[in-house]
């Protein structure tokens, strides 16, 4: 599954079950991405809110295309749309 993008960032909270599932899904697909812990980095937390309009995680940023507060099925659908 190849999506050619400049920047893929996943904003997570370490205790978030959906975040762990998103990490697992991206890792299984062999996606290179930056994992950002918004609890450890207040600036990243503020950026996540600015990008998504909410404070819920996970938030995926693929070259400015944002998927927020999602589960594995929504992630798979989002990824398919990116491949087109």
Which stretches of residues belong to each language-model region?
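Short alpha-helical
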Residues: 17, 43, 74
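Non-catalytic, surface beta->alpha helical segment in thiol-disulfide oxidoreductase systems
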Residues: 62-84
């Amino acid at each position: 599954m190849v999506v050619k993008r400049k920047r893929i960032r996943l904003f997570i909270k370490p205790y978030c079950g959906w975040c762990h599932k998103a990490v697992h899904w991206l890792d299984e697909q062999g996606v290179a991405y930056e994992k950002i812990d918004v609890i450890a980095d207040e600036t990243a937390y503020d950026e996540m809110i600015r990008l998504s309009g909410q404070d819920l995680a996970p938030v995926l940023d693929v070259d400015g295309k944002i998927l927020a507060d999602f589960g594995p099925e929504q992630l798979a659908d989002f990824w398919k749309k990116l491949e087109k």
